[in-house]
Amino acid sequence: MAVGPGVKMESGLEDLRGPTVMFSNIFGIGYEGVTFEEFVQTLKNRGATVLVDVRLNPISRKKGFSKTKLSEALGQHGIRYVHLRELGNPKENRDGFWDTYTPAWEAARENYRGMLDSEAAREALAYVEELACVEPAVGLMCFERSECNCHRDVILQRIKQQELALI
């Protein structure tokens, strides 16, 4: 049974809650240690129709993972590619992410959280949320296999915080 504002529930009461926006269809994905074929298969298995590249510079020494090649190849699989440079992590802030659960790791994450407060980053986050409202699944891509070693974890946490603020 559908629920939402103005809809009668089984109890006969009207649901007066506002719309709840849930972004459980946004997930992180890294390409470290996988082939392009494995990467695409993971996207398909997760139902992704859009891949958002959150690398500052969408280039890679790994075959198939630079912006143009990646966009073309994903298109052949029915997956749209979007690069959001505004969500990239500057080179000078990356090393701290590798020292998991240390003061350097916390500092790198805190520094990146501050970057997400910029107007450009807020607009990019809003765009990701808009995509999540109209697409079955949205992948956020960077290099690192482990999310806790990547800034995309901070992005996903920020989206979840914003989602909870709406409820």
PLM-predicted stretches and their roles:
Residues 10-167:
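Residues lining hydrophobic/aromatic ligand-binding pockets adjacent to catalytic sites
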Residues 2-4, 16:
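Compositionally biased, low-complexity intrinsically disordered regions
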